[in-house]
UniProtKB/Swiss-Prot annotation:
This is Suppressor of tumorigenicity 7 protein. It is a multi-pass membrane protein. The modification Phosphoserine is found at S386. It comes from Bos taurus. The chain crosses the membrane at residues 15-35, 62-82, 512-532.
Length: 585
């Protein structure tokens, strides 16, 4: 009973809203009716005659001055609107109407309960705007030597931008170096190698670091006669040098895996020694932190090599062990690698368990988290989903949950559906991504498109429902539905991260505002009138009088274009065309 009453109230509310939407048409007809009734007391005909007499006394110079002034004003408005649109990405007139006029006209709900929540949300969104525009390391990034360079050799295009590679160099310096590197010659060489821009110079420096370590081991081993094995452990090979060679010199994934295994032996020894000495001072603590980053990076890349080579179960085991051993290192986002590998195994129950841990309101979201959750819910209903049947009987609870999950994912990153539905071509993902941006969409779709295709009907459900998200967020830059407003900075950052041959997806689409088009048309029209009036003042004056007479006459319904030109000919007294004369011999 209560549900029926609630439904009736909702229908009544929708009817009232609909009636207010079209109330202006009723008001318009009422005004026309009042004007018709009061035409005699208001002396409308006399007033129109007076206006007509006044306009007839105007000279062509007045029209020239009027059109010239309006052209100047329209041109100034056009220039200002164009400058404001280029600088801020929106029309000034539209911005003023949305910010100031729409609240006065009742376009914003001013309930006190909503105001308190929205004010808190706005303050939080201001704090979040900086973090949302932060560039993140792509957890599924490819190998430069084995994948990016091979793409360059085949196509002749550079898949990585200088800005992206510069960010990677900064990450390497942060993860793989510390203040005490100058005490060890090999680490000092690698510290310079990470800053080197030339790839060949970096590779040469890595080989040099390995050779220096080898020479030092050969020289210092004979000095200790007691234990040769202990001395070799004291001087292990440089793990970061192997990392660089595996990333940039190896031309296949198998070669990269061999180098990473050598790096694991060296890195594991350094990690165990620094773990014992980490409490002896800040210098040893920094070394242990660096060795931890190196070890986690190596194990993660080894798991990715196993995934690339088809050993998916082995990769899943390595990722799980790594997450258990280092649970606090969330900066590598290893759970996203784990989700992708579990989807490849079609272990959807395990995927749901991982999502239950990481799809939390207190944790940062990503396209992988949101769209994987949407895929799991779509999987339950997509094989039987039909738009025609849903329109007849309505959506079931499971279908509604799937649609809401898709809307949630699309609101977080609206660029992904175009790549999943193959409406836009994919490129190699960059090494860094911007959350909610086009770069993140490419990185997600590059690895997860196959998983969506594997679930029957999932792409069909996505195709039928994803555009409905935009009806819930008509102003995504100002207010979101489930997330913070969409950040404005994504387009600029994505253009820096993605190569020039890729057309960056922009959301919301920046179409030229109507006011700019209207102003441009008005400016052009008035300028043309001014030019014609200046060149043909008498003809334009007669034409204007004829137009005024037609609009003010009682026979308005019978006018046509021929009557206009007949009046112009009568006023100018244009003589008829001479008849041709035939000469007879």
């Amino acid at each position: 009973m209560a549900e029926a009453g609630t439904g009736f109230l909702e229908q009544l509310k929708s009817c009232i809203v609909w009636s207010w939407t079209y109330l202006w048409t009723v008001w318009f007809f009422i005004v026309l009716f009042l004007v018709y009734i009061l035409r005699v007391p208001l002396k409308i005909n006399d007033n129109l005659s007076t206006v007509s007499m006044f306009l007839n006394t105007l000279t062509p110079k007045f029209y020239v001055a009027l059109t010239g002034t309006s052209s100047l004003i329209s041109g100034l408005i056009l220039i200002f609107e164009w400058w404001y649109f280029r600088k801020y990405g929106t029309s000034f007139i539209e911005q003023v109407s949305v910010s100031h006029l729409r609240p006065l006209l009742g376009g914003v709900d001013n309930n006190s309960s909503n105001n308190s929540n929205s004010s808190n949300g706005d303050s939080d969104s201001n704090r979040q705007s900086v973090s949302e525009c932060k560039v993140w390391r792509n957890p599924l990034n490819l190998f430069r030597g084995a994948e990016y360079n091979r793409y360059t050799w085949v196509t002749g295009r550079e898949p990585l931008t200088y800005y992206d590679m510069n960010l990677s160099a900064q990450d390497h310096q942060t993860f793989f170096t510390c203040d005490s590197d100058h005490l060890r010659p090999a680490d000092a060489i690698m510290q310079k190698a990470w800053r080197e821009r030339n790839p060949q110079a970096r590779i040469s420096a890595a080989h040099e670091a390995l050779e220096i370590n080898e020479i030092r081991s050969r020289v210092e081993v004979p000095l200790i006669a007691s234990s040769t094995i202990w001395e070799i452990k004291l001087l292990p090979k440089c793990a970061t040098a192997y990392i660089l060679l595996a990333e940039e010199e190896a031309t296949t994934i198998a070669e990269a895996e061999k180098l990473f295994k050598q790096a694991l032996k060296a890195g594991d020894g350094c990690y165990r020694r620094s773990q014992q000495l980490q409490h002896h001072g800040s210098q040893y603590e920094a070394q242990h932190r660096r060795d931890t980053n190196v070890l986690v990076y190596i194990k993660r890349r080894l798991a990715m090599c196993a995934r690339r080579l088809g050993r998916t179960r082995e990769a899943v085991k390595m990722m799980r062990d790594l997450m258990k051993e280092f649970p606090l290192l969330s900066m590598f986002n290893i759970h996203e690698n784990l989700l992708e590998a579990l989807l490849e195994l079609q272990a959807y129950a395990d995927v749901q368990a991982v999502l239950a841990k990481y799809d939390d309101i207190s944790l940062p979201k990503s396209a992988t988290i949101c769209y994987t959750a949407a895929l799991l819910k779509a999987r339950a209903v997509s094989d039987k989903f039909s738009p025609e049947a849903a329109s007849r009987r309505g959506l079931s609870t499971a279908e509604m949950n799937a649609v809401e999950a898709i809307h949630r994912a699309v609101e977080f990153n609206p660029h992904v559906p175009k790549y999943l539905l193959e409406m836009k071509s994919l490129i190699l993902p960059p090494e860094h991504i911007l959350k909610r941006g086009d770069s993140e969409a490419i990185a997600y779709a590059f690895f997860h498109l196959a998983h969506w295709k594997r679930v029957e009907g999932a792409l069909n459900l996505l195709h039928c429902t994803w555009e409905g998200t935009f009806r819930m967020i008509p102003y995504p830059l100002e207010k979101g539905h489930l997330f913070y407003p969409y950040p404005i900075c994504t387009e600029t950052a994505d253009r820096e991260l993605l190569p020039s041959f890729h057309e960056v997806s922009v959301y919301p689409k920046k179409e030229l505002p109507f006011f700019i088009l209207f102003t441009a048309g008005l400016c052009s029209f008035t300028a043309m009138l001014a030019l014609l009036t200046h060149q043909f003042p008498e003809l334009m004056g007669v034409f204007a009088k004829a137009m005024i007479d037609i609009f003010c006459s009682a026979e308005l319904r019978d006018w046509n274009c021929e009557s206009i030109f007949m009046r112009v000919e009568d006023e100018l007294e244009i003589p008829p065309a001479p008849q041709s004369q035939h000469f007879q011999n």
